[in-house]
């Protein structure tokens, strides 16, 4: 083991069993929100050999979308690429079991009529929506990349997206949907200086030779292609160690290889371990769940702080009590990278951003079917889709506030 400071992050493709589950849960959410934007949704999915189980709690007026959940499930599996038993899973023929009930009225009471309205007599309409649960959520941004994400997770996601791209466009038509990437970067302080290791494991058709075909073609069409496009100022990518399918074979994959569950890739979904995580998963949850909406808001806050030049990197924590609208806590950490007093940064955040759940939903326009595309390749720093929490619309307000 080298004495170098090495940090590692991983990503997975949309065909990974856990990501199939995230995709199904978010596809169900989007279908319900499209017909009834006020739908309350908490949907969990399990996949295993030949079976999909979708469970949870839903309150909605979207009767047609609710009745069509089975078809929504099948369509998403087929879109991912599991369309034949040769791939270990087939969206057309797999069993789909639905076990969904209504949202608890006790929870609904706290969301629909917050403590501020119910007990304290608040008149502001935004005080009427309480947090759907207690919890703590983190947001992070760093000037490592143009998208203000830590480099290791940003690079791992690019590799995963490229792996899926060359499978779907037929460049490497022997690839199958399941896959993982991992990137290890050497740091000098907090500056990424050298790409040390790339690990890429991909499901493939039987009979594909690793040394003569798979490894060199993955290097050419995925790894080299991504590194050529990267163009990072401080990172030396000239001689990384590359490990392709280091077990030697990856034919059996997807739900036949491993069971999958919604919400089991929360580090992949966020900052690759570079920043802290409050523990709550995202997929399958409507925005009344602060696990999701407040984590998005914290990314929005952090990204605007860095883009405003107030710090080179920032981590923001918010916390809620179930049934309360106002956060119970806000914490800002700039790691000594700030250009102004951190106390002023925290005060500016409080002035510029309204972190009550109803305000987050309003300001980010979250009652829309925008969630299925986030189920793979990360919820933050996306360069391939537009997401409201990635917008830099508060930079001038923050500058003025400090």
Curated annotation (Swiss-Prot):
Q: Keywords of this protein's UniProt record, alphabetized? A: ATP-binding, Cytoplasm, Magnesium, Metal-binding, Nucleotide-binding, One-carbon metabolism, Potassium, Transferase
Residue sites binding L-methionine per the record: 57, 103, 258, 289
Q: Which GO terms describe its biological process?
A: one-carbon metabolic process; S-adenosylmethionine biosynthetic process
Localization, per the record, is: Cytoplasm
UniProt GO molecular function: ATP binding; magnesium ion binding; methionine adenosyltransferase activity
What this protein is reported to do is described as: Catalyzes the formation of S-adenosylmethionine (AdoMet) from methionine and ATP. The overall synthetic reaction is composed of two sequential steps, AdoMet formation and the subsequent tripolyphosphate hydrolysis which occurs prior to release of AdoMet from the enzyme.
- What's the protein here called? S-adenosylmethionine synthase
**From which source organism is this entry?**
Mycolicibacterium vanbaalenii (strain DSM 7251 / JCM 13017 / BCRC 16820 / KCTC 9966 / NRRL B-24157 / PYR-1) (Mycobacterium vanbaalenii)
Name the encoding gene, please.
Answer: metK
């Amino acid at each position: 083991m080298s004495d170098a400071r090495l940090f590692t992050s991983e990503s997975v493709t949309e065909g990974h069993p856990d990501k199939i589950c995230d995709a199904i849960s978010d596809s169900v959410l989007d279908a319900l929100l499209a017909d009834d934007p006020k739908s309350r949704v908490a949907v969990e999915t399990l996949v295993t050999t030949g079976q999909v189980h979708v469970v949870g709690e839903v309150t909605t007026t979207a009767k047609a979308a609710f009745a069509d959940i089975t078809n929504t499930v099948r369509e998403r599996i087929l879109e991912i690429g599991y369309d034949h038993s040769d791939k270990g899973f087939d969206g057309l023929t797999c069993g789909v079991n639905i076990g969904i009930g209504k949202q608890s009225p006790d929870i609904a009471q706290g969301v629909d009529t917050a403590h501020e309205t119910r007990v304290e007599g608040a008149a502001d309409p935004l005080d009427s929506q309480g947090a759907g649960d207690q919890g703590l959520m983190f947001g992070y941004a760093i000037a490592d990349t143009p998208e203000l994400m830590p480099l290791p997770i940003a690079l791992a996601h690019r590799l995963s997206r490229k792996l899926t791209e060359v499978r779907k466009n037929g460049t490497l038509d022997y690839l199958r949907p399941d896959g993982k990437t991992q990137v290890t970067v050497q740091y000098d302080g907090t500056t990424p200086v050298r790409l040390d290791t790339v690990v890429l494991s991909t499901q493939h058709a039987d009979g594909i030779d690793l040394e003569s075909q798979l490894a060199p073609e993955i290097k050419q069409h995925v790894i080299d292609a991504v590194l050529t496009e990267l163009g990072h100022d401080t990172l030396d990518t000239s001689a990384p160690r590359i490990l392709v399918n280091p077990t030697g074979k990856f034919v059996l994959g997807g739900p036949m290889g491993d069971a999958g569950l919604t919400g089991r890739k929360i580090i992949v979904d966020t900052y690759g371990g570079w920043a802290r995580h409050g523990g709550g998963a995202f997929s399958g949850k409507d925005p009344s769940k602060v696990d999701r909406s407040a984590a998005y808001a914290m990314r929005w806050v952090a990204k605007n702080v860095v883009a405003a030049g107030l710090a080179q990197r920032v981590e923001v924590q918010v916390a809620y009590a179930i049934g309360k609208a106002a956060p119970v806590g806000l914490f800002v950490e700039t790691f000594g990278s700030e250009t102004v007093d951190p106390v002023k940064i925290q005060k500016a955040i409080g002035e510029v951003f309204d972190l009550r759940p109803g305000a987050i939903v309003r300001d980010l326009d979250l009652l829309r079917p925008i969630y299925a595309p986030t189920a793979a390749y990360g919820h933050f720093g996306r360069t391939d889709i537009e997401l409201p929490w990635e917008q830099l619309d508060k930079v001038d307000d923050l500058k003025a506030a400090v």
